[in-house]
Every structure is written in structure tokens, then in C-alpha cells.
From Swiss-Prot:
Post-translational modification comment from the UniProt entry: Not glycosylated.
Positions of the UniProt region annotated as 8 X 6 AA tandem repeats of [VT]-N-D-[ED]-[ED]-D: 226-273
Residue ranges with Polar residues bias: 211-224
Keyword line: Cell membrane, Coiled coil, Membrane, Repeat, Secreted, Signal
Originating gene: MSP9
Coiled-coil regions, chain positions: 644-734
Membrane topology field: Peripheral membrane protein
Keyword Coiled coil included in the entry's annotation: yes
PANTHER family: VACUOLAR PROTEIN SORTING-ASSOCIATED PROTEIN 72 HOMOLOG, YL-1 PROTEIN TRANSCRIPTION FACTOR-LIKE 1
Signal peptide positions (record): 1-23
Name used for this protein in its record: Merozoite surface protein 9
Extent of the Sequence repeats: 226-231, 232-237, 238-243, 244-249, 250-255, 256-261, 262-267, 268-273
Subcellular localization, as worded in the UniProt entry: Cell membrane; Parasitophorous vacuole lumen; Secreted
């Protein structure tokens, strides 16, 4: 009977365990990954990785000119080894669906489609470069080729590449609508209808690569496989490096997962830019990326520059680079016509190479140079569009995060404006700045600890020779009356500071609203009523969300071993209401051995601790500061309203008084104005009379003149008449004389 109970009990446990596992699997397939939602700020760090990777790093080539981007690239390479981050981005890009579910449905997201377009354009560009080099080699060996056209392998490979390029150009011309859709898409657009076209687009680019280079084909065709392999390998290698990358990003899953693919495909063009001009200004959407990268710690924590980028990107609409796409298609037509004229021959018969027009290669090369330039412009437009899509996805991820949190707490879904969401995003950047600072301080303390207490080779060898099963002996506290050594004091102080950093970091990640939580190094002190300042004052509303942590571990263990081996106990508690920040850890000075060195270390640790506490207070008081600002702003508005009313009343009174004065002055001036008007009228009348008299005089004078003229004319007429009469009389006298003479 006892055995039967044991069997039934074990069977029951097996069934329960199987149900739990199947439930977890169903939850994963259905959708939301809590790690993604609770760590939405991880998206920011991919942005910085993608830009530095694209613009300042080329694999196996010249080192980047920007030292910040060089460090960022190294951090990003380590980041990609951790699969949870790349999976998180994959879930977000797929609308919070699991990777397996999205693979089964065969759906692709916008960023992946843009990535395929970039890959295709890059393969197209590589083919153009290879053809240009082939043409140059033919021109250099022109005399030899003229002698042996039929069996020249260089000429034959050139013709093959031209045919491949012609097929590429024809393919682009046939799929113009697909390119335009990709360029004009929005962040919420779905590509289910264009799935087959996208796959053919990607495979078309890789087919052209196979004819050109076998190795490049293998890299490009296995794009997704290589991504998965790179993400799976070395998952446990990035503990501190992951935190140092917690700044800004959204895309390494699409743009930096495959080093062999993206480094060669997206960054080859940028190497030439850096060789020509190291001071190139790159842009994040519309805002220069230097404004995001070249900032100090304080600006990075406030996150204003990056949020300006997000605001500007969210305000944008429509596609990018439409003119570049039109120029690309038009130039492609000309290239296709030139290639068609040159490659009319049948390549199956090598004797046809005799008719190969070598003289037309110069024109083809010039056209290829122009075509390549337009292709580069189009590629940069596509990359800018990809960046905008990623920033929009970041915004979408945060909206989903807020909705999920509201559902968990049983609250209605938030419906607020974009500006309020952007303010919340700033808080996420503050969290990331704190986490980044924590990681930097931890690495600094580790280096300091290793320099002060270097491990000897003999100790390491002795540890290796010991059996793994030998249990560790926990370090016991100092006995009464026994003073600890100086080295152990320094070691314990550094370990305590690192423990507090881990504590604050965990509180920020897991429970951002936790108030009055005492760090583990301070929880065992006598003064248990002390609280941590800078926490949220509204903790009474949800006391069930807050936990106190008690650590039990071996001092010689690392933090991971401490948590995994011994464990962490979480207990609910009522928040403490009174008290201030506890004093920071102080080093105990014992003996006379190198006191200056110990004091210097103590000062460094105290300064670091003060900076941490100040920034932590700035973070936690951010919302309170906003509330105070809003209250002051409202008070100013009320005061301004009161002042405006008073000033309006005073102005009305002054206006009335002025109008009365004006009316009185007008009335006083009225009679004077009448007299002046009458005088002016009299003067005008006198002037008119004088003018009339003058006119009459002139008229009389004119009449007299006319009369005189008439008299003169009459006199002239009379004189003329008299003269005529005299002449007539003379004529009568002359014939009489003549008659008298004749008679004689």
C-alpha cells in the first residue's frame, strides 16, 4: 500500500510538471515575452551599435576613426553572443510573437524587408564593381586581346558578368512596384501580400552572387542560419559587457547579427568615405548621430538629445529617397540598353567573341560609374528609412509595455498623447544611464581589487589540484577582541560597494517603484528605521509590490555564485516611513602599512558612492520634479491671469480718461476752427473776384485790339480801292492820247 502511494504521488508530480511545461510553451507560442516587456529599454542599445557598425567599422579593413565607435563596436560584438537580447528584438519586430510562431506563419516584419533590399542592392553593387575591374583589365591588355579574342578567358568572364548585370537590371525594372512599396512603407505596414516577391528579391541577389564568387554566395544564402549560430554561441560570455551597452538601440537583430553579411554589405561604401574625409557627419533619421554619441555622462543620463531624435522621427511621414529610386530606375534602363547592344552574341560559341566591340567598353564604364553613384544614394536612403522604422518600433514597443503593465495591475489601458509617452521614454533612458554607470563602477572596482590583491600563480595551481567535491568553508566573522587584517578590511569594503551596486541595479530592473529598500550591506546595522531617500512618495498605494532582500553567501564567491548557490529570500514587508540615508561604508584603518594608499582608495570609493547616490536621487526624484514644475507653472498661470485682469481694468480707465480729454480739447478748438474757416472763405472769395476782374480787363483789351485790327483792315481795303480807281483812270487816259495821235 505504501509503495502504491509513492507511485501515485510520483505520477501526480509528473502530470503537474508536464502541465506546467505545456502551459509555458503555450504562453510562449501565444505571444508576450515578459523579459521583453520589462526590459523595453534594451532596444535603445541596438541603435548605437547599428550606426557605429554601419559607418565606422569594416571587417578586416582599416580601424574606425571615431574612438567611441571603436569601443561600441567591441561591445556590440559581445552583445550579439547573448541570445536573449536578439530574441527580444525578434519578438518585438514580430509584434510580440515568439520566434517559432513567426517562422511557422512565414510572416516578415518591415525591418527584415528593408534588410533584404539593402542586401540585394549591395550584391548589385558588388557585381558592378567586379565588372568595372574587368573592363579596366581588358583596357590595360587591349593589344593582347585583339590578337586572341576567341579564346580569351578575361573577355569571356566580362561577357558573363555583363549578362548577369543585364538580368539584374531587367529584374529591377520588372519589380518597380515592389521597390516603391518598400521605400514608401510605414512602421505599421504588413508585407504578407508581398512575401513571394521578397523571397524572390533576396534569392535574385544571391543568384547573381553565385556566378561571381562562390564564397560570397555561401555567406549570403545562409543569412538566417548564420544569425542563429552567431547568437547561440558563447551565451555566457557577456555579463558586464551587456550592461555597458545599455544606452540606445533597436536593430542589431536585423542589421548587425551577421558580421560577414552586414559588415561587407552595409559598410563597404563607408570605408571610402572615411578615407576621403574622416569628419563625415552621419545622421540618425534627420538629427546628426554625433549629437547622440558625443555627449558626457550627465547628458547621456538625461537623454534629451536622443529623445529629440525620437520626436523628430515620430513626426515624419511618407517614404524616403523617392527621387533616388526614380533616378536609379531611369539609369538602369540606359545600362540595360548598352548591355543589350554589347552582349547580342551567342556565348555558346567562343568564335563569336571575335565581334566583341572593345571600343564601346569606355562608354559602358562611364555609365556604370554614374549608375553606382545613384545606387549608393539609394542605399543610404533605404538605410535612413530602416532607421526610422526601427525608432517607430521602439515607440510601439513602449506602448505595448505600458498596456501590458496596466492589464497586470487591473487598470484601464492608458490613453495619452505622444508627448506624455516621450516623457516616459526619458525615464527609461535614465534607467539605462544608471545601469551603465553601475557597470562602469563595477568594472573599476574589479580592476582596483585585482591590482591590490593580485592572485598568485601558486594559489591558482593549488586551487586546480583540489578536488571539486571539497566543500568550501564559509568565512566566519571576527571573534570578539580579534582585529581583522588590513587586507581583509579593504577587500570587504570593495565587496560591500559592489554588492550595493548590484542591489540598486536589480531594483531598477525588476521593481522600479520600490521605495525604502535598504541595501544588503546596510540591512543588518543597528539603525533599522533608516530609509533610502529619493524613492517614490506614493508607495502606500501599492505596498504589496515591494520586497526586501536578504543575502546569504560566502564572501569568496562571485555575485552570480552567491545568488545561484545560496539563493535570495524575498519577503513582503510594510514600508518604513521615517529615516534618512544610511552612512556609506567607511574603511577601518589599522596598522601603519601604507596608510596613504588606503586613504586614496577610501576617497575614491566614497566619491564613487556619492556620485551613485546623487544620480540615483536624480532618477527617483524626476517625476516629483516634474510635478513641482507643473504646480509652479499653474501658479504662474493663475497669477498672470489676475495681473492681466487688473491691467485690463486699469487700461480701460486710462482709455476713458484720455478719450474725455480729447473730446474736451476738440470742443475747445471747435469755435476757433469756425472763424478760421470763415476767414479762409472770405479770402477765397476775394481771390475769385480779383481773378474775375483781371479776366474782364483782359477781355476788354482783346476786344479793343480786335477793333483796331478791323479798322486797320478797313483802311487797307479803302486804300486798295483808291489805288484801283486811280489805275483805271490812268488806263482810260492812255487810249485817249493814242487816238488823238492817230488822228493827227
Amino acid at each position: 500500500m505504501m509503495n502504491m502511494k509513492i507511485v501515485l504521488f510520483s505520477l501526480l508530480l509528473f502530470v503537474i510538471r508536464w502541465n506546467i511545461i505545456s502551459c509555458n510553451k503555450n504562453d510562449k507560442n501565444q505571444g508576450v515575452d515578459m523579459n521583453v516587456l520589462n526590459n523595453y529599454e534594451n532596444l535603445f542599445k541596438f541603435v548605437k551599435c547599428e550606426y557605429c557598425n554601419e559607418h565606422t567599422y569594416v571587417k578586416g579593413k582599416k580601424a574606425p576613426s571615431d574612438p567611441q565607435c571603436a569601443d561600441i563596436k567591441e561591445e556590440c560584438k559581445e552583445l550579439l553572443k547573448e541570445k536573449q537580447y536578439t530574441d527580444s528584438v525578434t519578438y518585438l519586430m514580430d509584434g510580440f510573437k515568439s520566434a517559432n510562431n513567426s517562422a511557422n506563419n512565414g510572416k516578415k516584419n518591415n525591418a527584415e524587408e528593408m534588410k533584404n533590399l539593402v542586401n540585394f542592392l549591395q550584391s548589385h553593387k558588388k557585381l558592378i564593381k567586379a565588372l568595372k575591374k574587368n573592363i579596366e583589365s581588358i583596357q590595360n591588355k587591349k593589344h593582347l586581346i585583339y590578337k586572341n579574342k576567341s579564346y580569351n578567358p578575361l573577355l569571356l568572364s566580362c561577357v558573363k558578368k555583363m549578362n548577369m548585370l543585364k538580368e539584374n537590371v531587367d529584374y529591377i525594372q520588372k519589380n518597380q512596384n515592389l521597390f516603391k512599396e518598400l521605400m514608401n512603407q510605414k512602421a505599421t505596414y504588413s508585407f504578407v501580400n508581398t512575401k513571394k516577391k521578397i523571397i524572390s528579391l533576396k534569392s535574385q541577389g544571391h543568384k547573381k552572387e553565385t556566378s561571381q564568387n562562390q564564397n560570397e554566395n555561401n555567406d549570403n544564402q545562409k543569412y538566417q542560419e548564420v544569425n542563429d549560430e552567431d547568437d547561440v554561441n558563447d551565451e555566457e560570455d557577456t555579463n558586464d559587457d551587456e550592461d555597458t551597452n545599455d544606452e540606445e538601440d533597436t536593430n542589431d537583430d536585423e542589421d548587425t547579427n551577421d558580421d560577414e553579411d552586414t559588415n561587407d554589405e552595409e559598410d563597404t561604401n563607408d570605408e571610402e568615405d572615411h578615407e576621403n574625409n574622416n569628419a563625415t557627419a552621419y545622421e540618425l533619421g534627420i538629427v546628426p548621430v554625433n549629437d547622440v554619441l558625443n555627449v558626457n555622462m550627465k547628458n547621456m543620463i538625461t537623454g534629451n538629445n536622443f529623445m529629440d531624435v525620437v520626436k523628430n522621427t515620430l513626426a515624419q511621414s511618407g517614404g524616403l529617397g523617392s527621387n533616388d529610386l526614380i533616378n536609379f530606375l531611369n539609369q538602369g534602363k540606359e545600362i540595360g540598353e548598352n548591355l543589350l547592344n554589347i552582349t547580342k552574341m551567342n556565348l555558346g560559341d567562343k568564335n563569336n567573341l571575335e565581334s566583341f566591340p572593345l571600343d564601346e567598353l569606355n562608354m559602358l564604364k562611364d555609365n556604370l560609374i554614374n549608375y553606382e553613384f545613384i545606387l549608393d544614394n539609394l542605399k543610404t536612403s533605404v538605410l535612413n528609412k530602416l532607421k526610422d522604422l526601427l525608432l517607430r518600433l521602439l515607440y510601439k514597443a513602449y506602448v505595448s509595455y505600458k498596456k501590458r503593465k496596466a492589464q497586470e495591475k487591473g487598470l484601464p489601458e492608458p490613453t495619452v498623447t505622444n508627448e506624455e509617452y516621450v516623457e516616459e521614454l526619458k525615464k527609461g533612458i535614465l534607467d539605462m544611464g544608471i545601469k551603465l554607470l553601475f557597470s562602469k563602477v563595477k568594472s573599476l572596482l574589479k580592476k582596483l581589487k585585482n591590482k591590490i590583491f593580485p592572485k598568485k600563480k601558486e594559489d591558482n595551481q593549488a586551487v586546480d589540484t583540489k578536488s571539486m567535491e571539497e566543500p568550501k568553508v564559509k568565512a566566519q566573522p571576527a571573534l570578539r577582541g580579534v582585529e581583522p587584517t588590513e587586507d581583509s578590511n579593504i577587500m570587504n569594503s570593495i565587496n560591500n560597494v559592489m554588492d550595493e551596486i548590484d542591489f540598486f541595479e536589480k531594483e531598477l530592473i525588476e521593481n522600479n517603484n520600490t521605495p525604502n529598500v535598504v541595501p544588503p550591506t546596510q540591512s543588518k546595522k543597528k539603525n533599522k528605521n533608516e530609509t533610502v531617500s529619493g524613492m517614490d512618495e506614493n508607495f502606500d498605494n501599492h505596498p504589496e509590490n515591494y520586497f526586501k532582500e536578504e543575502y546569504y553567501y560566502d564572501e569568496n564567491d562571485d555575485m552570480e555564485v552567491k545568488v545561484k548557490k545560496i539563493g535570495v529570500t524575498l519577503k513582503k514587508f510594510e514600508p518604513l516611513k521615517n529615516g534618512n540615508v544610511s552612512e556609506t561604508i567607511k574603511l577601518i584603518h589599522l596598522g601603519n602599512k601604507d596608510k596613504k594608499h588606503i586613504e586614496a582608495i577610501n576617497n575614491d570609493i566614497q566619491i564613487i558612492k556619492q556620485e551613485l547616490q546623487a544620480i540615483y536621487n536624480e532618477l527617483m526624484n524626476y517625476t516629483n520634479g516634474n510635478k513641482n514644475i507643473q504646480q509652479i507653472f499653474q501658479q504662474n498661470i493663475l497669477e498672470n491671469d489676475v495681473l492681466n485682469q487688473e491691467t485690463e481694468e486699469e487700461m480701460e480707465k486710462q482709455v476713458e480718461a484720455i478719450t474725455k480729454q480729447i473730446e474736451a480739447e476738440v470742443d475747445a478748438l471747435a469755435p476757433k476752427n469756425k472763424e478760421e474757416e470763415e476767414k479762409e472763405k472770405e479770402k477765397e472769395k476775394e481771390k475769385e473776384e480779383k481773378e474775375k476782374e483781371e479776366k474782364e480787363k483782359e477781355e476788354k483789351e482783346e476786344e479793343e485790339k480786335e477793333k483796331e485790327k478791323e479798322k486797320e483792315e478797313k483802311e487797307k481795303e479803302e486804300k486798295e480801292k483808291e489805288e484801283e480807281q486811280e489805275e483805271e483812270e490812268e488806263e482810260e487816259i492812255v487810249p485817249e492820247n493814242l487816238t488823238t495821235e492817230e488822228s493827227k
